[in-house]
Regions:
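C-terminal extensions
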Residues: 1-129
């Protein structure tokens, strides 16, 4: 996987800590243990909560080959793992992501439609099998 791309500004401290620790791609981040995340959080300004969020995003990026913004949308909508996505329905994914986008007040059309949700769920279920 490529180096971190499209990370929101809210993760800038975590990005700096990860890069200083030599972790510059999604695969390495996905594979970090809780202890390693805690060590990173203690070493600088990165928050444990944001590091865990980034690890969840990394899991979706690596496992499902999703773009980071789509993985972040799923994670923030409460679908943080490929197993959770595999257990969901397309309607539920559209509902949860749409609710999040409306609460953020982006004013743009929904990113996730039934076709997209179905595609993501199929990938997640293939991973599970």
């Amino acid at each position: 996987m490529a180096a971190f791309q499209d990370l929101p500004q809210s993760f800038r401290d975590e990005r700096i800590e990860l890069e200083q620790a030599g972790i510059a791609d999604w695969n390495r981040l996905r594979d970090l243990s809780d202890a390693e995340l805690s060590r990173l959080a203690r070493s600088g300004r990165a928050s444990p909560r944001n590091l865990k969020r980034l690890r969840a995003i990394a899991g979706l990026v690596c496992d499902l080959q999703l773009p980071a913004p789509d993985a972040a949308l799923l994670m923030h909508a409460g679908i943080a793992t490929s197993a959770a996505l595999a257990a969901s329905t397309p309607e539920r994914v559209v509902q949860q992501t749409g609710r999040l986008e409306r609460s953020l007040g982006t004013g743009r059309p929904a990113v996730v439609n039934l076709f997209t949700a179905r595609t993501w769920i199929q990938r997640a279920r293939q991973l599970r099998n």
